[in-house]
């Protein structure tokens, strides 16, 4: 069971990169989810934004794993993951109407244990259960412009407030806005409500309601909002419903998926892989 979703998601979030051969690299963010494979056995799934993989022209990307050492230090140990076959065909699965991608991977045992259970992906009723709406705080993890929190390669944790209304149901509102500054490299990172954010919810009589639980993953960051080439410091979050559906498509390509409203958010621009981050 997840005890502190912020800490657990920090452990499960990784930098994705691919060198471009000219001294630059394209960078994005991904996170690990634990789900059940077609054989009924547990598997580790890497989730990111579809455009992160699409903007990587090579067959192999690198996942920024982190290895803990006996003395309490950490080592950054990026490992290859194949994202295309020899003919250039995509090996990942993507949602038919939303910017979400998933690929089953064989992670080091330490990282496989860090994967977040799929049950922590939000459903429509989750927002109601936690009383989350416009103005409430959510957290986001990522690697803005390829920058990590330290030499060990941990992601940078930031926060913002829900900036749109309403945010459910996901079929009608497949994305929502988050009031925080987004940079290339952030795309694909998880957006979530932590245990602390949901622990104290006002009751109707003015008292505090019991803790709603350790939190949930609301979705993943996919775009930023720009107007006339000016960044508005607003992120676009794709709802977790579409992560669930993409993972289901890994097992069964005929699994049902929601054809969501595809009307673009004015000024939306992908938040990774459109600019290469220098090493």
What are these model-predicted stretches?
Residues 33-35, 165, 194, 223:
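Residue-level recognition of beta-strand microenvironments
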Residues 1, 6, 22:
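Short, surface-exposed loop/strand segments
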Residues 48:
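Cytochrome P450 catalytic-core helices
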Residues 6-9, 193-279:
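C-terminal subregion of chymotrypsin/trypsin-like serine protease catalytic domains
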Residues 19-45, 234:
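A conserved glycine-rich beta-strand in the N-terminal activation segment of trypsin-fold
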Residues 10-14, 18-20, 27, 56-175, ...:
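Serine endopeptidase catalytic core focused on the charge-relay Asp
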